[in-house]
């Protein structure tokens, strides 16, 4: 099973709590995180894109770096780990993304790929005057389908004459082209999103579900497998989890309860409000899960809380789910979390038994 790190491009990572570590996103922090992840044989690093935060006492995600420029920098200071940036497709023409991706392919030596997102948080785009109207909620995957067709033209042949409802290319050129086939990933959880991933993505991200229920996402992975069978493609699921680990189950649980007790209710209210704006995409979208009050303090990603041995066992359970090809991990404290993962958790995982046991990286 592949292991990736979801780097904290926004302040405070993925914990919406006054009791969680409070920090600003910087290149130096993310450089340290990704280099440490590479040392411990993580397979990939991904950054999201966020253009407006949730506010509240913690100013959650009010402070964000930009994904492509961050990952270009990280590509230059790593050598093995795969690097993925996220394109907010309403903000960037596909021909520009094609050229930026080809550039980072050159920087990384063929280790780069692109995560495509349609955009769900209306204020991110409204503040710039580029929100296309609420009809977009029901047409966003039509838009993304044309977008990726332009990308594939340009990466594959260096030229596009695509004509569609959203994009018109007139002998559009991009050169140099990527040195290897460019990976495209997506995070579709709705039926429309999964249909898109089945047709165009190399793999699909989905949320884990619940606390210490590592296989609860299995129905989502099964839906992705079924969608891919319709297109005759192999599109695996990569599952998002937060790891909160300590020497004992009780110590880890105490940390989790402490974070929940400090939940930033004002920021969470903003998230709930935004999740209700899309009335056209159905009830199975990512943002609906993010805003569920059950565990909104970490946007309801699957959460693995326990001793190092318990977390290793649960991750092996994740690997046993049909269609699950990898996990994307976040941590309550990224630097110490990756270190303890690499030294105390990964060596206990059967699905990572092929890797050497490593000790702390020497600076």
UniProtKB/Swiss-Prot annotation:
One Pfam family from the record: Bac_luciferase
Keyword terms of this UniProt record: Flavoprotein, FMN, Monooxygenase, NADP, Oxidoreductase
Protein name: Pyrimidine monooxygenase RutA
Binding site for FMN: 49-50, 115, 124, 140-141, 190
Similarity comment: family membership: Belongs to the NtaA/SnaA/DszA monooxygenase family. RutA subfamily.
Enzymatic reactions: uracil + FMNH2 + NADH + O2 = (Z)-3-ureidoacrylate + FMN + NAD(+) + H2O + H(+); thymine + FMNH2 + NADH + O2 = (Z)-2-methylureidoacrylate + FMN + NAD(+) + H2O + H(+)
Residue ranges crossing the lipid bilayer per the database entry: none
InterPro entries in UniProt: Luciferase-like_dom (IPR011251), Luciferase-like_sf (IPR036661), Pyrimidine_monooxygenase_RutA (IPR019914), SsuD_RutA_monooxygenase (IPR050172)
Any single GO BP term: nitrogen utilization
Organism of derivation: Escherichia coli (strain ATCC 8739 / DSM 1576 / NBRC 3972 / NCIMB 8545 / WDCM 00012 / Crooks)
Single GO MF descriptor: uracil oxygenase activity
Segments forming a coiled coil: none
The enzyme's E.C. designation: 1.14.99.46
Induction details: Up-regulated by the nitrogen regulatory protein C (NtrC also called GlnG) and repressed by RutR.
Gene field: rutA
């Amino acid at each position: 099973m592949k292991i990736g790190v979801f780097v904290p491009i926004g302040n405070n990572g993925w914990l919406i709590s006054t009791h969680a570590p409070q920090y600003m996103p910087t290149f130096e922090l993310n450089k340290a995180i990704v280099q440490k992840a590479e040392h411990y044989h993580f397979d990939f690093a991904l950054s999201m894109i966020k253009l407006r935060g949730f506010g509240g006492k913690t100013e959650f995600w009010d402070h964000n770096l930009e994904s492509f420029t961050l990952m270009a920098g990280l590509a230059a200071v790593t050598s093995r780990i795969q690097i993925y940036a996220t394109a907010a497709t309403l903000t960037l023409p596909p021909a520009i993304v094609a050229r930026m991706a080809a550039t980072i392919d050159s920087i990384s030596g063929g280790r780069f790929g692109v995560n495509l997102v349609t955009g769900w948080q209306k204020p991110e785009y409204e503040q710039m005057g580029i929100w296309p109207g609420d009809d977009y909620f029901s047409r966003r995957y039509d838009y993304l389908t044309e977008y990726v067709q332009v990308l594939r033209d340009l990466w594959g042949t260096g030229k596009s004459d695509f004509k569609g409802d959203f994009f018109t290319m007139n002998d559009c050129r991009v050169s140099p082209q990527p040195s290897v086939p460019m990976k495209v990933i997506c995070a579709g959880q709705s039926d429309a999103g999964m249909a898109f991933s089945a047709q165009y993505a190399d793999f699909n991200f989905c949320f884990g579900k619940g606390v210490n229920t590592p296989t609860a996402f299995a129905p989502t992975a099964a839906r992705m497998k079924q969608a891919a069978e319709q297109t005759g493609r192999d599109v695996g699921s990569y599952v998002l989890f937060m790891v909160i680990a300590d020497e004992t189950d009780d110590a880890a649980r105490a940390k989790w309860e402490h974070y929940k007790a400090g939940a930033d209710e004002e920021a969470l209210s903003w998230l709930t409000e935004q999740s209700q704006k899309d009335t056209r995409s159905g009830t199975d979208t990512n943002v609906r899960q993010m805003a569920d009050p059950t565990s909104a303090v970490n946007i309801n990603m699957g959460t693995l809380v326990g001793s190092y041995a318990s977390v290793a066992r649960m991750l092996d359970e994740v690997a046993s789910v049909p269609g699950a090809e990898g996990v994307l991990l976040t941590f309550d404290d990224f630097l110490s979390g990756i270190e303890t993962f690499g030294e105390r958790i990964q060596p206990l995982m059967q699905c990572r038994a092929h890797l050497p046991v490593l000790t702390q990286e020497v600076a």
